[in-house]
Amino acid sequence: MLFRSNQDYCKLKILGIEHIGIAVDDLNKTSSFWGNILNILHTHTEVVESEQVKTTIFDTKKGKIELLSPSASNSVIEKFIKNKGTGIHHVCLEVDDISQAIIKLEEKNVVLINNKPKIGAEGYKIVFIHPKSTGGVLVELAEKPK
């Protein structure tokens, strides 16, 4: 069998989908769509210096949409848009303990982009899993600030 439940295999506790990250080239225009047309509540905008990204967050109460715009030239988001265009950049899963998640993933030889948590938008501790390990999707794990 190729698939085992996480209880039998990794014991990684995923609390749910935290957000979907979308790379955009026009934050104001795209924000208008999510906020004014779809009427999703805008909760937060900030620049995350460590990632050179400006984030604008819309909360559906069952998951968030995080719009990502480069805040500096040569940022990861700018490169992504240049190479792949705008669109879904990553899926973020909330975990209860980011440090334990990193240990469990490394035990299973999962390739991480950063193996030490960084502070991301809204103060979450974050780590990214390389698309090589996920079937082509950039996955972010995030622990809510206490």
What is the meaning of each model-derived region?
Residues 1-2:
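Short, small-residue-biased leader/transition segments that mark boundaries at the very start
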Residues 8-13, 17-25, 56-59, 78-146:
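Vicinal oxygen chelate
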Residues 9-51, 75:
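Long, hydrophobic N-terminal alpha-helical segment
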Residues 18, 66, 140-143:
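Acidic-residue sensor for enzyme active/binding pockets
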Residues 30-33, 101-105:
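Hydrophobic side chains in well-ordered alpha-helices
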Residues 42, 48, 55, 66-79, ...:
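Intrinsic, low-complexity N-terminal interaction/targeting segments
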Residues 63:
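Conserved Rossmann-like nucleotide-cofactor binding loop
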